[in-house]
Amino acid sequence: MERVNAICRHALWRESVDEIARLEQDRAFCRHDRAHFLDVARLAYIENLERGLGVDKELIYAAALLHDIGRHLQYTQNIPHDEAGAQLAEIIMADCGFLPAERAEVTQAILQHRGDGDRSRDGLAALLYRADKASRMCLFCTAEPECNWSREKKNMTIRA
């Protein structure tokens, strides 16, 4: 997990996370912070283990730590956060020693994490999508009534 820890130490990652926090400080809805990134990583890894999918742990954690990293560029430059995040992830992962094929798999997962979410899919992109959605605890959110997520998409029960 040394390369994952290198992501967390990377100046571009830290600056991006700090800028997202600054821009979301008054946000009533779900935030895109370190806790969210780790929730997504852990949920994806649990599903990976439970289903025996064999997706590499480092790639799961890398994708989770990087999937929303482009949020600040969406807020400030109107660039879709998945596209901005994939570009930032490529730079960060290259600096942290990830191989080109690994970077491609993670950036593809980032680009697809807002997709249709076909729950029958396997692989990193599907794990990231499902964990990202499952990480949000709408049941306990005071902003839930104003949230634009559909009722079907909201997590109104605890599932295991």
Predicted regions and their residues:
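Metal-dependent phosphohydrolase cores
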Residues: M1-A160
